[in-house]
Amino acid sequence: MQKYGGTSVADPDRIKAVADHIVATRQSGQDVVVVVSAMGKTTDDLERLAHEVSTVPSGREMDMLLTAGERISIALLCMAIIDRGEHAVSFTGSQAGILTDTAHRKAKILEVKADRLRESVAEGSIAVQRRFDARRACPSCPPPAPTSSRSPVCPRR
């Protein structure tokens, strides 16, 4: 398992360097599963944009928005790995079998059914998964009420 944060994949040159490291690990005979964050300050930029277009961004839509940055990263990293002669497959959390509760912005992992990841690695692929953690909330937004999936009022106005 290798984990790369936003700084590690902040630009094309860094993505290529990460791909080189991953490919070297795979070519040494090791199976590789990679977890990667959004590029650079993408998550911060997306949160800022959400608060510019909405006084009360819903938790569900924030989750949807913030996963977009990591989807970009996993796709670009897979492209760079494939360009280096290895097979790579990107996975979202749901594709990887991560099951959570319904609390947007603070979801708890209930179960992991990693069959698709295991199958991909067993077939010789490098599995690349996004890092987005639904529990990572905007620091200024209050958590949703435990019995409600509706978004609370955001204090950033």
Give the role of each language-model region.
Residues 1-157:
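Nucleotide/pyrophosphate-binding catalytic subdomain
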